[in-house]
Amino acid sequence: MAAPGEALTSSGYIAHHLSNLSLYKLGLVGSETSFWNVHIDSLFFSWFTGLIFLGIFYKVAKRTTAGVPGKLQCAVEMIVEFVADNVKDTFHGRNPLIAPLALTIFCWVFLMNVMDLVPIDFLPYPAEHWLGIPYLKVVPSADVNITMAMALGVFALMIYYSIKVKGLGGFAKELALHPFNHPLMIPFNLLIEVVSLLAKPLSLGMRLFGNMFAGEVVFILCAAMLPWYLQWMGSLPWAIFHILVITIQAFVFMMLTIVYLSMAHEDSDH
């Protein structure tokens, strides 16, 4: 931020809005790269959107009726059926937890992405001037720590179900003897399979982060480069297009999760 009485430049405005409220910024850890440098705003808004998801679905579940459903119940039922159909078409194992997991991921990621449509200064301005909070980023999925944490969670489930379904020996055999089933090719197979395995969570998390971070940067540029009375001319068309991006990214994250877990449930001899 600029010093008191000093005008904030466009570059300063952009840098400020791309900065997280972290323990380092509050002087609670000594380094910005410290493992303990938690991004408080990203955690808060990820929890906030998660609670919204739980609240909506809990409310609908309690008020579900066999009669004429309300608009909210219809919307929730459409989402549930949409996710269930995709799981049925994509997941070929037997696991009753996959559909609820896919539903949670789709709705949670979608709600985190939707925060990108909140006007740039709508929450940061009152937070800074009324509450004394110097930095506030409201889009959790534009924080690589959040997206990679979710991707690593999916990765942990992949490893867990691979070992559970195939056995530790079967999982090791899959890494060592595929794609070339010959002892001399084991080092080459391991190199290919381990890189492929590690690339899954990396691409899963970075894809979501990259798309949402880029969208956030465009909104910030519109706010920084245009006078307030013209900002809508840049932000509105991008917001309309971004609605599609928000939905697609949530869908892609969900579908890749289903695909990866389906692969983990496949028999090693498949």
UniProtKB/Swiss-Prot annotation:
One of its GO terms (molecular function) is proton-transporting ATP synthase activity, rotational mechanism. The chain crosses the membrane at residues 38-58, 98-118, 143-163, 208-228, 239-259. CDD domains: ATP-synt_Fo_a_6. It comes from the Bacteria. SUPFAM superfamilies: F1F0 ATP synthase subunit A. It is found in: Cell inner membrane. GO terms for biological process: proton motive force-driven plasma membrane ATP synthesis. Keywords: ATP synthesis, Cell inner membrane, Cell membrane, CF(0), Hydrogen ion transport, Ion transport, Membrane, Transmembrane, Transmembrane helix, Transport. The keyword Mitochondrion does not apply. Its main location: membrane. One of its GO terms (cellular component) is plasma membrane. It is a multi-pass membrane protein. InterPro entries: ATP_syn_F0_a_bact/chloroplast (IPR045082), ATP_synth_F0_asu (IPR000568), ATP_synth_F0_asu_AS (IPR023011), F0_ATP_A_sf (IPR035908). It holds the Pfam family ATP-synt_A. Belongs to the ATPase A chain family. Key component of the proton channel; it plays a direct role in the translocation of protons across the membrane. F-type ATPases have 2 components, CF(1) - the catalytic core - and CF(0) - the membrane proton channel. CF(1) has five subunits: alpha(3), beta(3), gamma(1), delta(1), epsilon(1). CF(0) has three main subunits: a(1), b(2) and c(9-12). The alpha and beta chains form an alternating ring which encloses part of the gamma chain. CF(1) is attached to CF(0) by a central stalk formed by the gamma and epsilon chains, while a peripheral stalk is formed by the delta and b chains. This is ATP synthase subunit a. The lineage of its organism: Bacteria, Pseudomonadati, Pseudomonadota, Gammaproteobacteria, Vibrionales.
